């Protein structure tokens, strides 16, 4: 990539491109996720000025968020990335954009616990009532953030249940006291679902959706549907 001074030099010394097969002029928006950020308009103006020195050459500027700002940012090619996975790009209305990633795990054990018992490493969660606690076979080694302990929720059948205690390396615990017992076997648990999507889990983990996806390790099996 070139900074502004280098681009100016190149414009004045086009002979430096002799022998190169240049196919596209490309740049990348730094703040496309924020629709009213003035940087977007400034970058577009600078990009158009650069394009004017290379007439006829195709151009590409917009990532997922940039492609939703306005057609002015589209040019000959857009470069959607996270939108292909249904990731919501910042504060931009997404219309028909829908999440395509679901993350499931299984219940390994269900046990009863007494009011006052503590759950997980460090005993950070103390039960306020007699409870049913399920141990789920996923942990931070699978990419499930430790920040989600005591914050996140999972879906079991048609009912949600809170994650309680610390997230461990290979497991975590969920309070299933209010979940219909019929849903606990075979015990499929949805960690990402329509009611708790990437934007929600990222918010609870105090990170961004991109990090949630890229931290999914090799242990979770991938199943590609309707591909």
Show the residue positions of the predicted features.
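Active-site loop/helix belt of alpha/beta enzymes
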Residues: 1-106, 110-115
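C-terminal accessory subdomain/extension
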Residues: 112-227
């Amino acid at each position: 990539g070139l900074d502004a001074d280098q681009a100016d030099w190149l414009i004045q010394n086009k002979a430096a491109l002799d022998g190169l097969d240049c196919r596209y002029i490309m740049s990348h928006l730094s703040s496309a996720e924020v629709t009213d950020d003035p940087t977007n308009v400034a970058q577009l103006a600078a990009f158009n000025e650069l394009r004017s020195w290379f007439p006829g050459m195709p151009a590409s500027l917009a990532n997922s968020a940039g492609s939703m700002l306005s057609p002015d940012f589209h040019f000959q090619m857009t470069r959607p990335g996270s939108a292909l996975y249904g990731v919501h790009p910042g504060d931009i209305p997404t219309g028909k954009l829908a999440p395509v990633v679901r993350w499931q795990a299984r219940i390994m054990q269900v046990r009863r616990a007494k009011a006052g018992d503590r759950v997980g490493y460090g005993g950070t969660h103390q039960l306020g009532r007699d409870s049913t606690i399920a141990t789920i076979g996923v942990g931070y080694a699978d990419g499930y953030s430790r920040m989600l302990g005591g914050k996140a929720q999972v879906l079991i059948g048609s009912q949600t249940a809170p994650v309680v205690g610390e997230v461990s390396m290979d497991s975590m615990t969920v309070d299933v006291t209010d979940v219909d017992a019929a849903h606990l076997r075979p015990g499929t648990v949805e960690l990402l679902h329509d009611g708790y999507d990437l934007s929600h889990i990222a918010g609870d983990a105090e990170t961004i959706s991109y990090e949630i996806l890229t931290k999914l390790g090799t242990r979770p099996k991938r199943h590609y549907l309707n591909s």
